[in-house]
Curated annotation (Swiss-Prot):
It comes from the Bacteria. This is DNA mismatch repair protein MutS. InterPro entries: DNA_mismatch_repair_MutS, DNA_mismatch_repair_MutS-lik_N, DNA_mismatch_repair_MutS/MSH, DNA_mismatch_repair_MutS_C, DNA_mismatch_repair_MutS_clamp, DNA_mismatch_repair_MutS_core, DNA_mismatch_repair_MutS_N, DNA_mismatch_repair_MutS_sf. Belongs to the DNA mismatch repair MutS family. ATP binds at residues 607-614. Pfam families: MutS_I (PF01624), MutS_II (PF05188), MutS_III (PF05192), MutS_IV (PF05190), MutS_V (PF00488). It comes from Bacillus mycoides (strain KBAB4).
């Protein structure tokens, strides 16, 4: 290292402490990067890679960005998941002896970004910290540095379950200890695209103990300690805005796993991963950024306490019924800026004058908001605004201190109002009058010399000067001016009087800028005192904003207030899928009832593809979520229980973590529901069993239905293409067949999208294929095959027709007609086994008893004794398999 220059040695010493980050090393007006950082940054930022002499035999790779544009480049790197360590000059180069002292003043990471393109105003930017304990449990702590919010919870389950919970927080960065499993870290980085950071210290940092007063569990404190120590180590500044830690337990809220949230498209769509088209998109009529964030948090955690849900519903009803109150509140909320993040910027020391002006404008709305809510005859409203301080003294302070149109920078002056500080007023008087004197001097000198083009100007290098063109130099009185600068076409002069005024004016202007900066930083410290009150106000206003949002969308979309019941019954009259209805944009939407009495647990849904089975299932889930976050629901009448969990298996399986097959993911999701559901849960299973053979799929589907019906008792919607399962209605007294109806008109299918009692009589799959515009020849052949199948007593494989195939294709398998006797059957492949479910051609022919041997006659006798009406389909299939095996033994 001694081979390098002192400056490069300094760089390498700092870089050694930040190996996992880009080091932005301040050199004058630039941030420079060297060595590998330079090569990688030049590629990522698309900037020029150059080199410089660093004292060694080889030149050092180097790239840099201007300090005034660094924010944009830092955002680009952090957006890609990188970390950036900002190293500043911490002493004046003019007075430095040797190399200027430099220190890292902040480590900017995906989880600690305070502002920029990556920060959505209606999204939290959580940093997560995960701590693993020997008993298999985990503590998960989260912090949003932009708002100061802190949460912690205790989790149990498999590592993959825990990682999915972390993923559900939306965190872009997770802090773990250095012993955390490398395999699990790979899943976080490669699959979930999270940035990994390390922190081994778990004690609560000094000065932050007051934030964990409500936390007594040692496990939770360790997770919070890890989180806080990482934040302090990386940010290196005041964290006065950090809020007391909120403990939450997953059993206090409706549990909806990550897969179910995605399937239901609660906050983003499955296809585009965007908000537009999700339930959040529909319900978000909030007027403030903080209200938008609270709405999303409510949707992530629906309530399970009936009384709390009813309180919200009553408040929403109040807003629905009082149009003028609601509209007045909305108008005031429009003028409220993001109090939470403004408080964070105050604490962080990066608030500017415009931010404080936004704070004042927001506070001006608060008294009227609180007064309007206080007049409501509502206990929930009274409790909500209790202790809310409108901070009128802060409003007054900001009103008399900050200019109405201040500049963005706090170092350019013109921030503080006249009358706020006497000394500042004096400097401004000198500066203003001095400039007036300059203008008067210019006029006087023109009159004395007779040179009308004479002017007095200023630049930063030469100060004030009198400028006369060379053509007019002869008109100047001898000895009146002292020459200062010669130009190509003019001369510049100075006088003793002008020098004196210049000193006064420049000193005043310099002192004005410095004094304004000092006054602003002092003002910022005064505002810090109000941070807890501002954060409390933010919570109150956020909640009011969400409630008015529910009221607004409920009135616009004609939602109805649900009635919550302690009974296990569902009564939804004319229910609608709220998002589908909105997207149809005025087109006729077909509503559907969902009526499940206390003794009715399972709806077995059959019907055509594309008929609306999945929409109907999602519709019920969304209605329950909307109800339990306190919103009205899309129906003409709704009576609902309070569900503790929702489990779904709808649509294409989307495995976030393990890389399992689609069928395995389907089975794991089914297992999750079966293992964790209670009689207070809602289960939605769509086409379980499709990913395996027909026998296996049908057997699994029936076994799952029976288990839910007999052992769990959860309200369940189970859609299937296995029409054979509809006979379960005869043996399972709490199961009911329903179907989505369709009719045929002029050879075409018309989907009615209406749920009706009973099983569907046909699938209309060929009609769906026509809608997909499959080749007409293929459709014609499918219809021919279908006609042959439907014309037989049993399902059989129809005769093949000769089809021309490419020469490279294998020869077609031809079904050979055998004599009308039971043939010896070889062990079948999986494909053959699936085909054999439909039977061979010989199965449709009557057997000639004369050719049966004794064993076959005995089997026939056993078949005659079987009481099919007393067997489930699964038992029947097992019996058939046993008899077939007996025949094969020969």
């Amino acid at each position: 290292m001694t081979q390098y220059t002192p400056m490069i040695q300094q760089y390498l010493k700092v870089k050694a402490d930040y190996q996992d980050a880009f080091l932005f090393f301040r050199l004058g007006d630039f941030y420079e990067m060297f060595f590998e950082d330079a090569v990688k940054a030049a590629h990522e930022l698309e900037i020029t890679l150059t080199s410089r002499d660093g004292g060694s035999s080889e030149r050092i790779p180097m790239c840099g960005v201007p300090h005034h544009a660094a924010k944009n480049y830092i955002e680009q790197l952090v957006e890609k998941g990188y970390k950036v360590a900002v190293c500043e000059q911490v002493e004046d180069p003019k007075t430095a002896k040797g190399v200027v002292r430099r220190e890292v003043v902040q480590l900017i990471t995906p989880g600690t970004m305070m502002e920029g393109r990556t920060i959505d105003e209606k999204e939290n930017n959580f940093l997560a910290a995960l701590t693993h304990f020997e008993d298999g449990s985990y503590a998960l702590a989260c912090n949003d540095l932009t708002t100061g919010q802190n949460t912690v919870t205790l989790l149990t389950g498999s590592v993959e379950d825990i990682l999915l919970e972390v993923y559900a927080t939306g965190s872009k960065e997770i802090v773990v200890d250095s012993t955390f499993s490398k395999d699990e870290l790979n899943k976080l980085t490669e699959t979930l695209k999270m940035t990994i950071s390390y922190e081994d210290t778990t004690t609560i940092p000094e000065g932050l103990e007051h934030l964990v007063k409500s936390v007594s569990q040692a496990k939770l404190i360790k997770a919070i300690g890890r989180l806080f120590n990482y934040v302090i180590r990386t940010q290196k500044r005041s964290l006065d805005h950090l809020q007391p830690v909120e403990i939450y337990y997953t059993n206090q809220f409706m549990k909806i796993d990550v897969h179910s949230k995605r399937n239901l498209e609660l906050t983003e769509t499955l296809r585009t991963k965007e908000k537009t088209g999700s339930l959040l998109w529909l319900l978000d009529k909030t007027k403030t950024a903080m209200g938008g964030r609270m709405l999303k948090q409510w949707m992530e955690r629906p309530l399970i306490q009936k009384e709390k849900v009813e309180e919200r519903l009553e408040m929403v009803e109040t807003f629905v019924n009082d149009y003028f109150l609601r509209e007045d509140l909305k108008e005031k909320l429009k003028e409220v800026y993001d109090l939470e993040r403004l408080a964070g910027k105050v604490a962080f020391g990066n608030v500017n004058a415009r931010d404080l002006l936004q704070l004042r404008r927001s506070l001006l709305q608060v008294p009227a908001i609180l007064e309007a809510i206080s007049l409501l005859d509502n206990a929930y409203a009274a409790r909500l605004i209790q202790g809310a301080d409108p901070c009128e003294s802060l409003t007054e302070l900001l009103g008399r201190s900050i200019q109405e149109n201040p500049p963005l920078s706090i170092k350019d002056g013109d921030i503080i109002k006249d009358g706020y500080n006497d000394k500042l007023d004096q400097y401004r008087y000198v500066s203003k009058n001095g400039k007036t004197w300059i203008a008067e001097l210019e006029k006087r000198e023109r009159d004395i010399t007779g040179v009308k083009s004479l002017k007095i100007g200023y630049n930063r290098i030469f100060g004030y000067y009198i400028e006369v063109t060379k053509a007019n130099l002869g008109a100047l009185p001898e000895g009146r001016y002292e020459r200062k600068q010669t130009l190509a076409n003019a001369e510049r002069f100075i006088t003793d009087e002008l020098k004196e005024k210049e000193t006064l004016i420049l000193e005043a202007e310099e002192k004005i800028v410095q004094l304004e900066y000092d006054l602003f930083t002092a003002l910022r410290e005064e505002v810090k005192v109000f941070i807890p009150k501002l954060q409390h106000l933010a919570k109150v206003i956020s909640e009011l904003d969400v409630l008015q949002s529910f009221a607004t969308v409920s009135e616009e979309e004609q939602f109805v207030k649900p009635v919550l019941t302690n009974k296990r019954e569902i009564f939804i009259k004319d229910g609608r899928h709220p998002v589908v209805e909105k997207v149809l944009n005025g087109k006729l939407y077909v509503p559907n009832d969902c009526i499940m009495p206390e003794k009715m647990d399972v709806f077995l849904i059959t019907g055509p593809n594309m008929s609306g089975k999945s929409t109907y299932m999602r519709q019920l889930a969304l209605v329950t979520v909307m109800s339990q976050i306190g919103c009205f629901v899309p129906a003409t009448e709704a009576v609902l229980p309070v569900f503790d969990q929702i489990f779904t298996r709808i649509g294409a399986a989307d495995d976030l973590i393990s890389g399992q097959s689609t069928f395995m993911v389907e089975m794991l999701e089914a297992k999750n529901a079966i293992a964790n559901a209670s009689e207070r849960s809602l289960i939605l299973f769509d086409e379980i069993g499709r990913g395996t053979s027909t026998y296996d799929g049908m057997a699994l589907a029936q076994a799952i239905i029976e288990h839910i019906h007999d052992q769990i008792g959860a309200k369940t919607l189970f859609s299937t293409h296995y029409h054979e399962l509809t006979v379960l209605e005869e043996s399972l007294d709490q199961l009911k067949n329903v179907h989505v109806s369709a009719i045929e008109e002029n050879g075409k299918v018309v989907f009615l999208h209406k749920i009706q009692d009973g099983a569907a009589d046909k699938s209309y799959g060929i009609h769906v294929a026509q809608l997909a515009e499959l080749p007409e020849s293929l459709i014609a052949r499918a219809k021919e095959v279908l006609a042959q199948l439907e014309g037989q007593e049993e399902i059989v494989i129809p005769k093949r027709v000769e089809v021309k195939v490419p020469e490279v294709a294998p020869e077609p398998v031809v079904v050979k007609e055998e004599p009308a006797e039971i043939q010896e059957t070889k062990v079948e492949t999986e494909e053959e086994s699936q085909l054999s479910f439909f039977g061979g051609e010989q199965s449709s022919k009557k057997q000639d008893k004369s050719v049966l041997d004794a064993k076959e006659t005995a089997v026939l006798a056993q078949i005659k004794k079987i009481d099919l009406l007393d067997m489930t389909p699964l038992e029947a299939m097992n019996e058939l398999y046993r008899l077939q095996k007996k025949l094969k033994k020969g």
